């Protein structure tokens, strides 16, 4: 997996280490409720659902209808699936 080195920082390392400490779904809910706004959490979840649907071969139209994602978001996720660091796999 190739990660953009410009993203690497001590703050990001600390965030990811904290996430890796979470052991249950309830701990995840508590952590993300405190660290994200409701809209930020919804956006993250939506992008994961979009990625899943793109990998399954669903059309943009179906994805928009089922997730409410914009075509811009779908395109961004698709670009990450094709050219990204394999973070969605």
Positions of PLM-derived features:
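Short, Lys/Arg-enriched anionic-surface-contact patches
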Residues: 26-46
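Short, amphipathic alpha-helical "recognition" segments used to contact nucleic acids or chromatin
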Residues: 44-58
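General nucleic-acid-binding
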Residues: 1-22
